[in-house]
Amino acid sequence: MLIALIAVSVLAVAAIIGSLADRRAIGRRAERAESERDVKALELSRSQERLSRASQDLADSRKDVAKARAELESSRTRASDEARRADNADQARRSAEALLEINRRSVEELTERDHRLQEARRHLEEGLDKIEQDRLELAERSSQLDERDAELDRRHGQIVTELERVAGMSLDEARDELVEHLGREARVFAENSARAIVTEATASAEAKARHIVAEVIQRCSSEMVADTVVSVVPLPSNEMKGRVIGREGRNIRTFEQVTGVTVIIDDTPEIVLLSCFDPMRREVARQALTDLVEDGRIHPISIERAHQRAVDRIEDMCLDAAADALSRAGIDDIDDRLLPILGSLRFRTSYGQQVLDHCVECARLAANLAAEIGADIEICRRAAFLHDLGKSLTPGVEGSSHAAIGAELARRYGESEEVIHAIAAHHDEIDPVSVTDFIVKAADAISAARPGARRESLEAHVRRMDTIEEIATSFPGVVRAFALQAGREMQILVDPGAVDDHQASRLARQIALAIGEQVTVPGRTRVTVIRSFQAIETVGDA
């Protein structure tokens, strides 16, 4: 009985070993199949991972089989030993049954693992088939797209060829013409936009500026006396003319030599004219001659004494004029050494406008402008009052402008840098940078451009008008040019065939810039370009 049990056990073990051998053969075939497949996608990678896990399970199964074989061999050895040691058949039978139960469980576990391995392999094969099918579909779709692109390129070439034939130009020529057309449209649009922006900004700025200037001017009303180059000295009688002339003209020669003026005695009754371009010397001569006429004693010595007394009075008048101007301008803290220089401006004129009164008016205008726009009132008032300080020394200093001389005098007598810079920049000899600089320029322009404030000779006026018209007619396309309102307005007629509407705007801007650079015109100059086209036809008999 024991021998039969052992034989059955041996047969069972042999069957298990054979089954394991078959499973190993199947595993080797699966591995060879796996190595031949091309993994080209994410699903294949995942399938490989599942296959790897299945292979690991197979390896674990092999280890378990080996372990079971070892246990079986050990059990057989123990069974043999126990059979030899057993004294009865029951003990051997129970041992064999236990061994068979162990073997049965091992076989069931191996069978279950083999089933899982087969299932994993089946899923892997299905995934590979799907990937291959997708690859084939993608290749077919790519081929179709390539064919479609080729067809589109062919049709595009046919269309371009037909368009070139119909248009009578090549593709490059059409592109160049389109670029040129777009460029013209862009320029026209840019000019229209720029003109609209400039017009709107100018209108807004002019409205605001007119409001501010009107508010400022209505609070500043100044009397303005324009001196001439001739002073009149009344005489008590015509006999006094002979005494003024003296024996053989001795008195008049001495008077002209001492005073530096020209004495004009004509047929006009009871007056003598004193002519001189220097108002101070003319005023000294007038007072000296008035004293001589009142005294009645006219000879070279009395002429010299009267001249000295007049010079002393003029110096006192300069100090009084400076103090009065400071009071009217609202300035009280200034270096006393500047008073004689400021007072001498009482006898200086610019285009007939008295410079000292002009400085006072500028100071008041600048203070009001500063108050309107929120600038420093006192700095603007001071800079505007001193802006023409250099005119007191300009005739005696060559090679320097009155703005540069005035700035140097202001620096010498302790004025602030802001005031100095405003004085130097009020005629754009240096660039204006601060609000004070622009306010001083504006006040100077308002005072000078006010109607009746300044005048010039007819010859200079006509020459300036001719120059302005010549500048305008020098531009191509200009037919006629008319300077109006003392050069403050230009009306220009252009050839409508040579200048279109957009070029007319650009031409007006160019002419305005040229006039501003080449001619000095008080105030602003407005340039109007007129482009008129007329078509006239006649019908009927004369």
UniProtKB/Swiss-Prot annotation:
Top-level division of the source organism's lineage: Bacteria
Entry EC number(s): 3.1.-.-
One Pfam family of this chain: HD
Keywords in alphabetical order: Cell membrane, Endonuclease, Hydrolase, Membrane, Nuclease, RNA-binding, Transmembrane, Transmembrane helix
Compartment(s) of residence: Cell membrane
InterPro entries: HD/PDEase_dom (IPR003607), HD_domain (IPR006674), HDIG_dom (IPR006675), KH_dom (IPR004087), KH_dom_type_1 (IPR004088), KH_dom_type_1_sf (IPR036612), Ribonuclease_Y (IPR017705), RNase_Y_N (IPR022711)
Membrane disposition: Single-pass membrane protein
Domain KH, residue spans: 229-289
SMART domains: HDc, KH
Gene Ontology molecular function: any one: RNA binding
Role summary: Endoribonuclease that initiates mRNA decay.
Similarity-based family: Belongs to the RNase Y family.
PANTHER family, A to Z: RIBONUCLEASE Y
Protein name: Ribonuclease Y
Species, as recorded: Cutibacterium acnes (strain DSM 16379 / KPA171202) (Propionibacterium acnes)
